[in-house]
Design a protein with these regions (language model features):
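Phosphate-group recognition and catalysis centered on beta-loop-alpha active-site segments
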Residues: 1-121
Length: 121
């Protein structure tokens, strides 16, 4: 969240994030599918539940942001989001609707299948 806070504080109105789904269906605003490179833990996000990820720290200090938290904390930010799995697409649609963020989220993907799936809903 600290990166998004910094962007907002500097006056940026648009941010970008990838989202990965945890094993129990929580969307995380995180670039990598694995924890190994950026955190103090190891493993794949999609194989772990949020209860075990909530204590993981990015660069040893910052928690991984939940997408719902990001959308709620920064209602004035426009967010470009890439769902990184098919599972994340359905969860993303539900999260956007639940947070009322339809008019400030742009969804993009290098996967045509994911984009078609998103557009179909």
């Amino acid at each position: 969240m600290v990166a998004f806070e910094g962007a907002a504080r500097l006056g940026f109105r648009y941010v970008e994030t990838d989202v990965h789904a945890t094993a129990d269906g929580v969307l995380l605003a995180f670039h990598d599918p694995h924890l190994d490179r950026l955190t103090d833990q190891h493993g794949r996000i999609d194989r772990l539940e949020w209860s075990s990820l909530r204590h993981v720290r990015v660069a040893g200090t910052e928690p991984i942001a939940r997408l719902e938290e990001l959308l709620g904390e920064f209602p004035d930010l426009r967010v470009n989001i890439e769902p990184k799995s098919d599972v994340a697409v359905e969860l993303l649609i539900n999260t956007i609707r639940r947070t009322g963020a339809e008019m400030r989220v742009c969804v993009g993907s290098f996967s045509d299948r994911r984009l078609h799936r998103f557009r179909a809903v």
